[in-house]
């Protein structure tokens, strides 16, 4: 029995709901750690919490907390996520204006990092990404949550920093103890090819060709041969929103040529 486009849109929503729920689950202990640090309370196991005088969390404490949260998801047999972590802005990490507590999942013949058989820490300090560090607040994955105070999906785009592949970046704002100031984002990267493995069977179960597009009409995945990832799709005979996401399923989408 074939599916309807609405059922396919529901399947898309379910996948992204799972990632957003995971981000929310990670955000809570990170905010608790930062709040405890601001209050001068050592929040991490082993007495490695922040000092009362600074109100800042120690980098090692933050890194340990974030690693304990994200590594289990990156170590799954068939992980949905290819990267995850927390990016701190401002003066919440001792001795740092910005701090990337970010890990990459196992990589296969990556042109930048080679192949890895387990998660690795993203170390921007050794890779010459000074411009990236200087300008990251202007990037969509950070700028939109900072402006709206809501979770956001960026992409699809080619991640030249880490995976060198089409990805979607999901980010959620992390706030200070008062909940008034955003102090960073918790986030996760999903490779488009991983998303395709999770959803393609559902898309193929509809007789008409379909395309999953973002709010700008850019293709994430498609069963229309004329449409490739990243291409702009033209209007379709029907558009079905994917609830809780910026995506929609277009039925019989036209190729725009760009």
Name each model-derived stretch.
Residues 72-73, 80-91, 208-212:
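Short, hydrophobic-rich beta-strand element in sensory/regulatory alpha-beta domains
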Residues 137-162, 193-203:
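Short, basic/aromatic recognition patches
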Residues 1-42, 46-58, 166-167:
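Juxtamembrane extracytoplasmic/periplasmic/luminal helical "stalk" adjacent to the first N-terminal
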Residues 81-147, 222:
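Extracellular/periplasmic ligand-sensing ectodomains of membrane signal-transduction proteins
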Residues 190-219:
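Solvent-exposed, extracytoplasmic
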Residues 163-199:
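Conserved beta-strands of PAS-like sensory domains
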Residues 225-258:
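Extracellular/periplasmic juxtamembrane segments that couple receptor/chemosensory ectodomains to their
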Residues 20, 24-27, 59-75, 196-200:
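Short amphipathic alpha-helical segments
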């Amino acid at each position: 029995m074939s599916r309807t486009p609405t059922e396919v849109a529901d399947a898309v929503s379910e996948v992204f709901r799972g990632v957003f729920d995971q981000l929310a689950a990670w955000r809570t202990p990170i905010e608790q750690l930062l709040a405890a640090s601001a209050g001068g309370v050592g929040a991490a196991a082993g007495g490695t919490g922040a000092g009362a005088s600074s109100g800042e969390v120690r980098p090692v404490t933050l890194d340990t907390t974030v690693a304990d949260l994200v590594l289990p998801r990156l170590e799954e047999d068939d992980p949905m996520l290819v990267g995850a972590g927390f990016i701190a802005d401002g003066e919440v990490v001792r001795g740092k204006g910005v701090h990337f507590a970010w890990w990459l999942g196992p990589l296969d013949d990556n042109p930048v990092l080679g192949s890895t058989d387990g998660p690795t820490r993203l170390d921007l300090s050794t890779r010459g990404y000074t411009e990236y560090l200087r300008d990251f607040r202007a990037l969509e994955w950070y700028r939109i949550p900072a402006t709206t105070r809501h979770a956001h999906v960026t992409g699809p785009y080619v991640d030249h920093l880490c995976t060198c592949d089409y990805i979607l970046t999901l980010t959620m704002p992390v706030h200070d103890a008062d909940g008034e100031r955003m102090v960073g984002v918790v986030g996760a990267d999903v490779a488009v090819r991983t998303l395709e493995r999770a959803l393609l069977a559902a898309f193929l179960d509809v007789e008409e060709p379909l395309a999953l597009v973002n709010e700008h009409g850019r293709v994430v995945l498609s069963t229309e041969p004329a449409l490739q990832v990243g291409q702009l799709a033209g209007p379709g005979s029907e558009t079905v929103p994917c609830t809780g996401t910026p995506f929609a399923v277009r039925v019989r989408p036209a190729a725009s040529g760009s």
